[in-house]
């Protein structure tokens, strides 16, 4: 990854609210399924904005085995996704998205960020990100003191 895209808490909330406004009216949804872990915080934000109390998770782990990237489903929500929003923070190459689509073919799959390779796999997203860009999410960062350049 050659570039970095830094996401602040404020930016994330603004993007989540924009996405929530596109998902109105909220009564059309039975609930939200957040993809663990990246979709947990956006899922909480959507649940708040849409007034949805039924929130579940699908937990997927990816790991390298003989240089192949494999997905392992650790926990899944029941059903085919009908009436549910599936939320993840990002669709990148589409590996996780393909697995989600297979598990929940009737769900409405959304993300905050989308890279070109995965974009066709989601129903909606807010921000386009170049494929070679690494996203730094606010839950992965802390606020630290940065000394002045002059050193004084």
UniProtKB/Swiss-Prot annotation:
Q: Where does guanine bind?
A: 92, 135
* Residues involved in xanthine binding: 92, 135
Q: What is its EC number?
A: 2.4.2.-, 2.4.2.22
CDD domains, alphabetized:
PRTases_typeI
**Cross-referenced Gene3D superfamilies:** 3.40.50.2020
Q: What does the record give as its pathway?
A: Purine metabolism; GMP biosynthesis via salvage pathway; GMP from guanine: step 1/1; Purine metabolism; XMP biosynthesis via salvage pathway; XMP from xanthine: step 1/1
GO CC list: cytosol; plasma membrane
- Keywords assigned by UniProt? Cell inner membrane, Cell membrane, Glycosyltransferase, Magnesium, Membrane, Metal-binding, Purine salvage, Transferase
The family database entries (Pfam families) matched by this protein are listed as: Pribosyltran
GO BP term, example: GMP salvage
Residues binding GMP, per UniProt: 69, 92-96, 134-135
Catalytic function, reaction form: GMP + diphosphate = guanine + 5-phospho-alpha-D-ribose 1-diphosphate; XMP + diphosphate = xanthine + 5-phospho-alpha-D-ribose 1-diphosphate; IMP + diphosphate = hypoxanthine + 5-phospho-alpha-D-ribose 1-diphosphate
Q: Which domain of life is it from?
A: Bacteria
Where is this protein localized, as stated in its record?
A: Cell inner membrane
* CC cofactor: Mg(2+)
The membrane-topology field of this record reads: Peripheral membrane protein
One GO MF term, please?
xanthine phosphoribosyltransferase activity
Instruction: Give the residues the record marks as binding Mg(2+).
Output: 89
Report quaternary structure and partners: Homotetramer.
Family, according to the entry, reads as follows: Belongs to the purine/pyrimidine phosphoribosyltransferase family. XGPT subfamily.
User: What PANTHER family does the record point to?
Assistant: XANTHINE PHOSPHORIBOSYLTRANSFERASE, XANTHINE-GUANINE PHOSPHORIBOSYLTRANSFERASE
Which HAMAP family did the record assign?
XGPRT
Tell me the function of this protein.
Purine salvage pathway enzyme that catalyzes the transfer of the ribosyl-5-phosphate group from 5-phospho-alpha-D-ribose 1-diphosphate (PRPP) to the N9 position of the 6-oxopurines guanine and xanthine to form the corresponding ribonucleotides GMP (guanosine 5'-monophosphate) and XMP (xanthosine 5'-monophosphate), with the release of PPi. To a lesser extent, also acts on hypoxanthine.
Instruction: Identify this protein by name.
Output: Xanthine-guanine phosphoribosyltransferase
Organism of derivation: Escherichia fergusonii (strain ATCC 35469 / DSM 13698 / CCUG 18766 / IAM 14443 / JCM 21226 / LMG 7866 / NBRC 102419 / NCTC 12128 / CDC 0568-73)
């Amino acid at each position: 990854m050659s570039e970095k895209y830094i996401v602040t808490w404020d930016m994330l909330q603004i993007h989540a609210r924009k996405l929530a406004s596109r998902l109105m009216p909220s009564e059309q949804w039975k609930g939200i399924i957040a993809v663990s872990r990246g979709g947990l915080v956006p899922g909480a934000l959507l649940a708040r904005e849409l007034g949805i109390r039924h929130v579940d998770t699908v937990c997927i782990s990816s790991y390298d085995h003989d240089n192949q990237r494999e997905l392992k489903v650790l926990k899944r929500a029941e059903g085919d996704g009908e009436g549910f929003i599936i939320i993840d923070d990002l669709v990148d190459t589409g590996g996780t998205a393909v697995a989600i689509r297979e598990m929940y073919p009737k769900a409405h799959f959304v993300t905050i960020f989308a890279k070109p390779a995965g974009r066709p796999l989601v129903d909606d997203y807010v921000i386009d990100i170049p494929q070679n860009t690494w996203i730094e999410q606010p839950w992965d960062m802390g606020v630290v003191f940065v000394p002045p350049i002059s050193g004084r």
